[in-house]
Curated annotation (Swiss-Prot):
Residues 1-2, 58-65, 151-177 are cytoplasmic. It comes from Salmonella typhimurium (strain LT2 / SGSC1412 / ATCC 700720). Pfam families: TrkH. This is Trk system potassium uptake protein TrkH. It is found in: Cell inner membrane.
Length: 483
C-alpha cells in the first residue's frame, strides 16, 4: 500500500477544495451578509491541512493499484466532507453543533439533501450558496466516480455494461485516461447546469435562486435556498423545468456523451435501462395523479398533474425537492414515493438508490427462475440489450443487493436503539442510504430533531449509499490490508 502517494493525492484534493471557499466568500462580499469570515478561516485552515499532507510527499509517484483506488475514493469523500463542515462550525449564523455541521456537509457533498437547518430564508446568502455549491461539486465527483473510476475498480452499476452499450466500461472506456473522461463528463455537467439556471431565470426565478437551484437540480441533491423548497415559488412552469432537468440528470451520462459525440437521440431508447427508468416515472405519475384526483386534493386536473409529475420525479430520482407537504396526501402515496427511491436513477448518473439497471436485472433473474420451475432442464440466458450477460455479473448484482439489505437492516435497528420510533427510523434510513433527503415521520421536514448518535449513523449511511456500499465495506475486510 503506497500510503505516501495516497497522502499526496488527498492533500492535493484538500488544497483544491480550499480554493472553492473563494466563491461563497465573494457572495458574502456582494450581499454584505457578514458570513465572509467563516469562509476566509476555512480557506486558510484547509490550505494548511492540504499543504501539510501534500508537501512532504509531493515527489511520491508510486504506481497506484485497485487497493489504493478504494482507499483514495473513500478518503476523498470523508476528508472533503469533514473539511466541508468547517464553514458551518465557524459561522455564527447558523449556529450549528459539530454533529449538525458534519451532517450538513456530508449531506451536501453526497447530494443527499437531508438537512438539520431551519429558517433558511433568514440565513446569510453566502451560507445558502455554499450549501448549493457543496452539492454541485459533490455531483461532479459522483459523475467521475460512477462512470470512470468505480468500473475500473470493478464496483458500481456501470460495470454491468459491456461493449455495445454506451458509456465507459472496464474494457471499453470513453477515453483512455480518467482525466480525459473527467473533462468530457464535466463539460456535459456544466452545460446542463447553465441551461437549467437560464431556464429557471427566464421562468421568473431570481438569479441567486436560479443558480442555486440549478446546482442542486443537476446534482440531484435537493437542497433549496428556502424552507418551502421549490414550493416557495408557487410556479407550475418552474416545477416542470426542474422535473425535466432531474430526468435528464437521472440518465446515464454515458448516453449524454454519445449524443455529444454526434449519435442520434435513438441511443437513449436503445438503452434498456433508460426505457425502464422512463417507464417507472410514467407509471408512478399516472398512479399519483389518479389517487390525488380521486381524493380531490387539488382544485384542478392540471394542478393535480403538475404536482404529481414534480413530486414523483423529485422523489424517484432521489432529489427530494418538495412543492407541497406530501404528508397531507393519502398515506399510500408518500410511502410509495419513499419506496420509489430504492430504484433511484440510472447507473452513471448523479441519482442515488439501488440504480435502475440492478432492479432490471433482478427482475430478469426472477423471471428466469419462474421459467426454470416449469422447464427445469432448459437453459435460459439473461440479456442486456442484445448481449447475454455472464453469470459473474448477475452474482455481483445479488451480492450488492445482499450487502445493501444488510447495511439497511443494521442501520435501522441501530437508530431504533437510540430511541427513534420504528417508522421514522425506517424513513430516515431510506432517505439517507438512497441519498434521497426528506423522509416521513419526524424527518418529514428536516432531521433537526434526531439525536446526535442517530445523526452519525445516518452520515455513515450517506457514505454507504454514495460509494455503492462495497467501496466502503471492502475497507473493513482483513484481506484488503494484508500485503
Amino acid at each position: 500500500m503506497h500510503f505516501r502517494a495516497i497522502t499526496r493525492i488527498v492533500g492535493l484534493l484538500v488544497i483544491l477544495f480550499s480554493g472553492t471557499m473563494i466563491l461563497p466568500g465573494l457572495v458574502a462580499l456582494i450581499y454584505r451578509d457578514g458570513a465572509g469570515r467563516a469562509f476566509t478561516q476555512t480557506f486558510f485552515v484547509a490550505l494548511a491541512i492540504g499543504s501539510i499532507l501534500w508537501w512532504p510527499n509531493r515527489r511520491e509517484k508510486g504506481e497506484l493499484k485497485s487497493r489504493e483506488g478504494f482507499l483514495i475514493v473513500v478518503l476523498f469523500w470523508t476528508v472533503l466532507g469533514s473539511v466541508g463542515a468547517l464553514p458551518f462550525i465557524f459561522s455564527e449564523s447558523p449556529n450549528l453543533t459539530i454533529t449538525d455541521a458534519f451532517f450538513e456537509s456530508f449531506s451536501g457533498l453526497t447530494t443527499t439533501g437531508a438537512t438539520t437547518l431551519v429558517g433558511l430564508d433568514s440565513l446569510p446568502h453566502a451560507i445558502l450558496f455554499y450549501r448549493q455549491m457543496l452539492q454541485w461539486f459533490g455531483g461532479m465527483g459522483i459523475i467521475v466516480l460512477a462512470v470512470a473510476i468505480l468500473p475500473i475498480l470493478g464496483v458500481g452499476g456501470m460495470q454491468l455494461y459491456r461493449a455495445e452499450m454506451p458509456g465507459p466500461l472496464k474494457d471499453n472506456k470513453m477515453r483512455p485516461r480518467i482525466a480525459e473522461t473527467a473533462k468530457t463528463l464535466w463539460l456535459i455537467y456544466v452545460l446542463l447546469t447553465v441551461a437549467c439556471a437560464l431556464a429557471l431565470w427566464f421562468a421568473g426565478m431570481p438569479a441567486f435562486d436560479a443558480i442555486g437551484h440549478s446546482f442542486s437540480t443537476i446534482a440531484i441533491g435537493g437542497f433549496s435556498t428556502h424552507d418551502a423548497s421549490v414550493g416557495y415559488f408557487d410556479s407550475p412552469t418552474i416545477n416542470t423545468i426542474i422535473a425535466i432537468f432531474l430526468l435528464i440528470s437521472g440518465c446515464n451520462y454515458g448516453l449524454h456523451f454519445s449524443l455529444l459525440s454526434g449519435r442520434s437521440l435513438k441511443v437513449y431508447w436503445r438503452d434498456p435501462e433508460f426505457r425502464m427508468f422512463i417507464g417507472v416515472q410514467l407509471t408512478l405519475v399516472v398512479i399519483c395523479t389518479l389517487v390525488l384526483w380521486f381524493h380531490n386534493i387539488y382544485d384542478s386536473a392540471l394542478t393535480t398533474l403538475n404536482q404529481a409529475f414534480f413530486q414523483v420525479v423529485s422523489m424517484a430520482t432521489t432529489a427530494g425537492f418538495t412543492t407541497d407537504s406530501i404528508a397531507r396526501w393519502p398515506l399510500f402515496l408518500p410511502v410509495l414515493l419513499l419506496c420509489s427511491a430504492f430504484i433511484g436513477g440510472c447507473a452513471g448518473s448523479t441519482g442515488g438508490g439501488l440504480k435502475v439497471i440492478r432492479i432490471l436485472l433482478l427482475f430478469k433473474q426472477g423471471n428466469r427462475e419462474l421459467k426454470r420451475l416449469v422447464h427445469p432442464n432448459a437453459v435460459y440466458s439473461i440479456k442486456l440489450g442484445n448481449r447475454a450477460l455472464p453469470e459473474r455479473i448477475l452474482e455481483a448484482v445479488w451480492g450488492f443487493f445482499s450487502a445493501y439489505a444488510l447495511v439497511f437492516i443494521v442501520s435501522m435497528l441501530a437508530i431504533i436503539a437510540t430511541g427513534v420510533d420504528d417508522f421514522s427510523a425506517f424513513a430516515s434510513v431510506v432517505a439517507t442510504l438512497n441519498n434521497l433527503g426528506p423522509g416521513l415521520g419526524v424527518v418529514a421536514d428536516n432531521f433537526a430533531s434526531m439525536n446526535p448518535v442517530a445523526k452519525w449513523i445516518l452520515i455513515a449511511n450517506m457514505l454507504f449509499g454514495r460509494l455503492e456500499v462495497f467501496t466502503l465495506l471492502v475497507l473493513f475486510t482483513p484481506t484488503f490490508w494484508r500485503e
